[in-house]
C-alpha cells in the first residue's frame, strides 16, 4: 500500500456535486450533552470549507460517536455537534435523524448552494461496524445482506467520497471501505497524515531516527521489526528499556517493569539491528521511586549501581537525556512513539520534557519530526509544542498499525492517482 499516490480532495472536481465526507466527530460530551472538547470538529473545518468554496451542491457529513453497539441511543446522538458546527462555520447545518434511508436521501437531494447536512451516528446501525452487542453484551454479527444494503444507502448520498477520519482508518467499517463511488479521496487531515508517514516510511531524509518508548517489548515487536530495515538509529526508552538492560547487560532493575515474554526476543532485535547497521541507544541512568505515585520517595541510579530492590525506574536521568539529545541533533528525520518516563507525574516528567525540547529544536533547524499519535501526542499537546513540530498524528491505533507495516483498510479503499 503506497501512501504517496492516493487521490486527495484537491485532485477532485467538486462543482455541483454531493460531497460525502467521513469525518471524525467522536467528541467528548458531558452529562448535559455539552461538548467538552471541540478539537476534532475544528480539525475537519478546512475540508468542509474547501468543499463549500469549490462549489459543492451539498456537503454531507457522517461520523460515529461513542459505542452505542449498533442500536439507536439518544446519549450518543450527534445532534449537539450540529449546533457546534453552525457556531464554528456561521452557516446553517441540517441534522438528518438517520444516516441512511429515503428521508435522508430526500434531504440530501434537495440541498443546494453548499448546504451542510450532518447525518445521525453511523454506529446506531450494526451494519457500520459489522456487529452489535446483545443484552448479555455478547457480539452478534450483522447480516451480510443488510450490511450491503447499508453500504448502498450511504453510497446513495454522494457523488464524491472524501475520507477525513484518520483515527478510524485501521477499521474496515462500512463508512470507511463500503462507499462505492467512482472517486474516493482523502480530506486535508488524512492527506497530511499520509504525506508525513510517507516521508518517514517510504522516502526518509537520512539519518533517520526512531524513538520508541512504551511499557512492553512484546507490544512493540511488530513496530521494531518494521522499522529496523528503515532507520539508521533507534532510541529505546520508557519502561521497555529495562527489559533490554537486564537481558543484554544484566543491569539490576529493582522493581521496574520486566517483560518476560519480551526478554526472549531482545537478542533477535539486537542481531537484526546489527545486520541493518542500526545504532541502538539505550538509557544509562534512571530516576527511581519507591512507589508509582507523585509523592513517592525518589532516588537516582546508574547502570553500574543498578536500581535497588523496592525501587523502580519511572524516568531516565540526565546522562541518558544527553545521549538522546545528541542522537536527535544528528538526525534529519525523527519519528517518536512513546515517552521516556511517566510524564503524567511531575517528578518523572523531566526526560520527556527535555526530549520534546530537543525534538522541537530539531524541527526548527529543518529536520522532519513526526509524533506517532497516542501518549506522545498527549505530551506535545500538554507542553504546547504541536505547532512547533512537523506533524503530530491524530490516529492512535491507526498510526501504530501504519508504523507496524500493516495495510489500513480506510487508506487502501481510497482511489489511486
Curated annotation (Swiss-Prot):
Enzyme Commission designation: 2.7.2.3
One Gene Ontology cellular component annotation held by this UniProt entry: mitochondrion
Pathway: Carbohydrate degradation; glycolysis; pyruvate from D-glyceraldehyde 3-phosphate: step 2/5
Self-association state and partner proteins as the record states: Monomer.
Record localization: Cytoplasm; Mitochondrion
Binding annotation for Mg(2+): 215, 219, 375
UniProt-annotated binding residues for CDP: 214, 219, 238, 338, 343
Name of the protein: Phosphoglycerate kinase
Annotated residues for binding of ADP: 214, 238, 343
Pfam family, one: PGK
Amino acid at each position: 500500500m503506497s501512501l504517496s499516490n492516493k487521490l486527495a480532495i484537491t485532485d477532485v472536481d467538486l462543482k455541483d456535486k454531493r460531497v460525502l465526507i467521513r469525518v471524525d466527530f467522536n467528541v467528548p460530551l458531558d452529562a448535559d450533552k455539552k461538548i467538552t472538547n471541540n478539537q476534532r470538529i475544528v480539525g475537519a473545518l478546512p475540508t468542509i470549507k474547501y468543499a463549500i468554496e469549490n462549489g459543492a451542491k451539498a456537503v454531507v457529513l457522517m461520523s460515529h460517536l461513542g459505542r452505542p453497539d449498533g442500536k439507536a441511543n439518544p446519549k450518543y446522538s450527534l445532534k449537539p455537534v450540529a449546533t457546534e458546527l453552525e457556531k464554528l462555520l456561521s452557516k446553517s447545518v441540517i441534522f438528518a435523524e438517520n444516516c441512511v434511508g429515503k428521508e435522508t436521501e430526500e434531504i440530501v437531494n434537495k440541498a443546494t448552494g453548499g448546504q451542510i447536512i450532518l447525518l445521525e451516528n453511523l454506529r446506531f446501525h450494526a451494519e457500520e461496524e459489522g456487529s452489535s452487542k446483545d443484552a448479555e453484551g455478547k457480539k452478534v454479527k450483522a447480516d451480510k445482506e443488510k450490511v450491503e444494503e447499508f453500504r448502498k444507502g450511504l453510497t446513495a448520498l454522494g457523488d464524491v467520497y472524501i475520507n477525513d477520519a484518520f483515527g478510524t482508518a485501521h477499521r474496515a467499517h462500512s463508512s470507511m471501505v463500503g462507499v462505492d463511488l467512482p472517486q474516493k479521496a482523502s480530506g486535508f487531515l488524512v492527506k497530511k497524515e499520509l504525506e508525513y508517514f510517507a516521508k518517514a516510511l517510504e522516502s526518509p531524509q537520512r539519518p533517520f531516527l526512531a524513538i520508541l518508548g512504551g511499557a512492553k517489548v512484546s507490544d512493540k515487536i511488530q513496530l521494531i521489526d518494521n522499522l529496523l530495515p528503515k532507520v539508521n538509529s533507534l532510541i529505546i526508552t520508557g519502561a521497555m528499556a529495562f527489559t533490554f538492560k537486564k537481558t543484554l547487560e544484566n543491569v539490576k532493575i529493582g522493581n521496574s517493569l520486566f517483560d518476560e515474554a519480551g526478554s526472549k526476543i531482545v537478542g533477535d532485535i539486537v542481531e537484526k539491528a546489527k545486520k541493518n547497521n542500526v545504532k541502538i541507544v539505550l538509557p544509562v541512568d534512571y530516576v527511581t521511586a519507591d512507589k508509582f505515585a507523585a509523592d513517592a520517595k525518589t532516588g537516582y541510579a546508574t547502570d553500574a549501581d543498578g536500581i535497588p530492590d523496592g525501587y523502580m525506574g519511572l524516568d531516565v536521568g540526565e546522562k541518558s537525556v544527553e545521549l538522546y539529545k545528541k542522537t536527535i541533533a544528528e538526525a534529519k528525520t525523527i519519528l517518536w512513539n512513546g515517552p521516556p518516563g511517566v510524564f503524567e507525574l511531575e517528578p518523572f516528567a523531566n526526560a520527556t520534557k527535555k526530549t520534546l525540547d530537543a525534538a522541537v529544536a530539531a524541527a526548527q533547524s529543518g529536520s522532519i519530526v513526526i509524533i506517532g499519535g497516542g501518549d506522545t501526542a498527549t505530551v506535545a499537546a500538554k507542553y504546547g509544542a504541536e505547532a512547533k513540530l512537523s506533524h503530530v498524528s491524530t490516529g492512535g491505533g491507526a498510526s501504530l498499525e501504519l508504523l507496524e507495516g500493516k495495510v489500513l483498510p480506510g487508506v487502501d479503499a481510497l482511489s489511486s492517482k
